[in-house]
Amino acid sequence: MSTKNFRVSDGDWICPDKKCGNVNFARRTSCNRCGREKTTEAKMMKAGGTEIGKTLAEKSRGLFSANDWQCKTCSNVNWARRSECNMCNTPKYAKLEERTGYGGGFNERENVEYIEREESDGEYDEFGRKKKKYRGKAVGPASILKEVEDKESEGEEEDEDEDLSKYKLDEDEDEDDADLSKYNLDASEEEDSNKKKSNRRSRSKSRSSHSRSSSRSSSPSSSRSRSRSRSRSSSSSQSRSRSSSRERSRSRGSKSRSSSRSHRGSSSPRKRSYSSSSSSPERNRKRSRSRSSSSGDRKKRRTRSRSPESQVIGENTKQP
């Protein structure tokens, strides 16, 4: 069969023998070249495109021939001599890939592998972590635990039974039983009593000297305080005398003012009578108004009532 007239259709298979590699029709059960039977290992062929045929070639008016093929993925029409599509590089004849579903494609969940896990009552779980109920507890057979405890107790007893001579524990007792005559304990007591007496005497002397110095230091301070008190008393007496003199002068001034006012009041009718007799009635009115403005409304009334009387008195005085 010539390669030009060879056409691959769906279902054709390739011989599983690597040396042979012959492409057989889908209807054959054994290889046409080597005679090997068809097995599951044989890879199926898949056509990436189909020939357009004579009808479409005639419609193209000489642009395409009947052997040209159309791609199945992008529907581009390619020449017959091309083994791959000119647009998407899809092969004209390709091997059919096995669809296992592990890559996320078609038939993904058909053959699912389940991992069987057995729940055990052991100390650790499937991830190697210690279970909560076994945390903080010694897990193991009772016999093993007893053996461990027995070994620990035996080790402690052996440690206690070891030779203790190297530690020299009796040296303290020997030191307590030693001769204490060389230390003179009575002499130390006498020295302590003498020291206490001398300390008391020195304290009494220091207190007496301190009292004397304090009395001496207090004497100039007391004299200063006395002088200050005297100066304060003298200043207070002077201020009092000044205040009393001021009060006396003020009282005298007030008395003199009152007496002068009384004298003025007594002499006013005479002056008014003389002035009224000598001056005109207009002047008397002006004077009475000026006096009434200074003394108040009551004085105005008095001056008005007295003005005609003063004129009568003046006339009477003129006549002998």
Swiss-Prot record:
<feature type="modified residue" description="N6-acetyllysine">
    <location>
        <position position="54"/>
    </location>
</feature>
<dbReference type="InterPro" id="IPR001876">
    <property type="entry name" value="Znf_RanBP2"/>
</dbReference>
<feature type="modified residue" description="Phosphoserine">
    <location>
        <position position="120"/>
    </location>
</feature>
<keyword id="KW-0507">mRNA processing</keyword>
<feature type="modified residue" description="Phosphoserine">
    <location>
        <position position="9"/>
    </location>
</feature>
<dbReference type="GO" id="GO:0008270">
    <property type="term" value="F:zinc ion binding"/>
</dbReference>
<feature type="compositionally biased region" description="Acidic residues">
    <location>
        <begin position="150"/>
        <end position="163"/>
    </location>
</feature>
<feature type="compositionally biased region" description="Low complexity">
    <location>
        <begin position="232"/>
        <end position="242"/>
    </location>
</feature>
<protein>
    <recommendedName>
        <fullName>Zinc finger Ran-binding domain-containing protein 2</fullName>
    </recommendedName>
</protein>
<comment type="function">
    <text>Splice factor required for alternative splicing of TRA2B/SFRS10 transcripts. Binds to ssRNA containing the consensus sequence 5'-AGGUAA-3'. May interfere with constitutive 5'-splice site selection.</text>
</comment>
<keyword id="KW-0677">Repeat</keyword>
<feature type="region of interest" description="Required for nuclear targeting">
    <location>
        <begin position="151"/>
        <end position="320"/>
    </location>
</feature>
<feature type="modified residue" description="N6-acetyllysine">
    <location>
        <position position="18"/>
    </location>
</feature>
<feature type="compositionally biased region" description="Basic residues">
    <location>
        <begin position="251"/>
        <end position="273"/>
    </location>
</feature>
<keyword id="KW-0694">RNA-binding</keyword>
<keyword id="KW-0863">Zinc-finger</keyword>
<dbReference type="GO" id="GO:0003723">
    <property type="term" value="F:RNA binding"/>
</dbReference>
<comment type="subunit">
    <text>Interacts with the C-terminal half of SNRP70/U1-70K, the Arg/Ser-rich domain of AKAP17A as well as with U2AF1 and CLK1.</text>
</comment>
<feature type="compositionally biased region" description="Low complexity">
    <location>
        <begin position="211"/>
        <end position="224"/>
    </location>
</feature>
<feature type="modified residue" description="Phosphoserine">
    <location>
        <position position="153"/>
    </location>
</feature>
<feature type="modified residue" description="Phosphoserine">
    <location>
        <position position="181"/>
    </location>
</feature>
<feature type="modified residue" description="Phosphoserine">
    <location>
        <position position="193"/>
    </location>
</feature>
<keyword id="KW-0508">mRNA splicing</keyword>
<keyword id="KW-0539">Nucleus</keyword>
<dbReference type="InterPro" id="IPR036443">
    <property type="entry name" value="Znf_RanBP2_sf"/>
</dbReference>
<feature type="compositionally biased region" description="Basic residues">
    <location>
        <begin position="196"/>
        <end position="210"/>
    </location>
</feature>
<keyword id="KW-0007">Acetylation</keyword>
<dbReference type="InterPro" id="IPR017337">
    <property type="entry name" value="ZRANB2"/>
</dbReference>
<dbReference type="GO" id="GO:0001530">
    <property type="term" value="F:lipopolysaccharide binding"/>
</dbReference>
<keyword id="KW-0862">Zinc</keyword>
<feature type="zinc finger region" description="RanBP2-type 2">
    <location>
        <begin position="65"/>
        <end position="94"/>
    </location>
</feature>
<keyword id="KW-0479">Metal-binding</keyword>
<feature type="zinc finger region" description="RanBP2-type 1">
    <location>
        <begin position="9"/>
        <end position="40"/>
    </location>
</feature>
<feature type="modified residue" description="Phosphoserine">
    <location>
        <position position="188"/>
    </location>
</feature>
<dbReference type="Pfam" id="PF00641">
    <property type="entry name" value="Zn_ribbon_RanBP"/>
</dbReference>
<keyword id="KW-0597">Phosphoprotein</keyword>
<dbReference type="GO" id="GO:0006397">
    <property type="term" value="P:mRNA processing"/>
</dbReference>
<feature type="modified residue" description="N6-acetyllysine">
    <location>
        <position position="92"/>
    </location>
</feature>
<dbReference type="GO" id="GO:0008380">
    <property type="term" value="P:RNA splicing"/>
</dbReference>
<comment type="similarity">
    <text>Belongs to the ZRANB2 family.</text>
</comment>
<dbReference type="GO" id="GO:0005634">
    <property type="term" value="C:nucleus"/>
</dbReference>
<feature type="region of interest" description="Disordered">
    <location>
        <begin position="117"/>
        <end position="320"/>
    </location>
</feature>
